[in-house]
A protein has these predicted regions:
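Helix-loop-helix hairpins in multi-pass membrane proteins, especially solute transporters
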Residues: 75-206
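Transmembrane alpha-helical segments of major facilitator superfamily
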Residues: 59-67, 152
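Residue-level signature of mid-helix packing/kink "hotspots" within the transmembrane helices
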Residues: 36, 67-72, 156-157
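The feature captures the transmembrane alpha-helix scaffold of multi-pass secondary transporters
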Residues: 18-25, 37, 107-115, 275
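Extracytoplasmic
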Residues: 16-56, 60-61, 71
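Hydrophobic transmembrane-helix bundles of small-molecule transporters
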Residues: 164-276
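Hydrophobic residues within the alpha-helical transmembrane core of Major Facilitator Superfamily
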Residues: 29, 65, 99-100, 115, ...
Length: 276
């Protein structure tokens, strides 16, 4: 075993206390507060940048769409490089995405920023949740999740209040809060969170995850269009191609020896009931 893998395996044996739980609570709260801050700022953004209707709807939802489309891929990446590294990547992406939004001169740049931030949000929330067993130690996982959830709610409220106050000054100022928090967390995370063991031998299921991501994005776009554009060609094109891509994902995962998602889980009534 290499010294790097030995260190990674030994790290979780350390004891991590309340500070570590506090950190993952703050990490998850950045993801939780971000969409709310965006929604509060959106009327001012739309007026300033001159868009409405479909553009406004897409600007509000595209961050969540990119989060949903990449969350499984993020889990697969964490298996390869470790959860803490995924969290650090998420911090960089969410900070960068919000900064792009803060300086955006047009709807296109704004959407780019929201996509980048959405991927970062997915990495942070998934990473924070995945850290719970690593920092639980002698405590029960349920107890740590209880503390984490409480801190998540508290800091979501705090960040939302501060973000809304900054938006009252300028909507661009509202998007500076999350990058500042992310920058602080970049300094704190390496000192307070353990690195998790990595499965470096597994191959990355790029084809399967790509079809899943594209399929989820198209279906979610179709759902967002359903309320106002049920009869439009765009709605049906997104829906049909999205369903085809999800079906292709299922076929790929069933045949792949390195499947990112065990498709056989859907044979379990308990799993299906939990998902629904």
């Amino acid at each position: 075993m290499s010294s790097e893998n030995a260190a990674a395996s030994a790290t979780p044996a350390r004891t991590f206390g309340f500070v570590s739980v506090l950190v993952i609570g703050i990490l998850a709260a950045t993801q939780s507060a971000d969409p709310g801050i965006t929604s509060v700022a959106m009327p001012s953004i739309a007026k300033d940048l001159g868009f409405s209707g479909a553009g406004l709807s897409l600007a509000v939802s595209i961050g969540t769409l990119s989060l949903a489309a990449t969350v499984i891929a993020i889990g697969a990446l964490a298996d390869r490089i470790g959860v803490r590294r995924v969290i650090m990547i998420g911090l960089v992406l969410e900070a960068l995405g919000n900064l792009i939004v803060a300086v955006s001169p047009s709807l296109a740049v704004l959407l780019l920023g929201r996509v980048v931030a959405g991927v970062g949000m997915g990495a942070l929330f998934a990473g924070a949740f995945s850290m719970v067993p690593a920092i639980a130690g002698k405590r029960t996982i349920a107890a740590v999740i209880g503390q984490w959830t409480g801190l998540l709610y508290i800091f979501t409220i705090i960040f939302s209040i501060i973000g809304s106050a900054l938006i009252g000054i300028s909507w661009r100022a509202g998007f500076i809060l999350i990058p500042v928090v992310c920058l602080i967390m970049m300094l704190v995370v390496p000192k307070t969170l353990p690195e998790t063991p990595r499965r470096g031998s597994s191959k990355f299921d790029f084809l399967g995850l790509s079809t899943l991501g594209l399929g989820m994005v198209l279906v979610l776009v179709a759902v967002s269009l359903a309320a106002t554009s049920l009869g439009s060609p765009t709605f049906w094109i997104c829906l049909i191609i999205g369903i085809i891509m999800l079906g292709l994902f299922a076929v790929i995962e069933k045949k792949s020896p390195n499947a990112a998602f065990p498709i056989e889980l859907f044979k379990s009534p308990v799993f299906v009931a939990a998902v629904l």
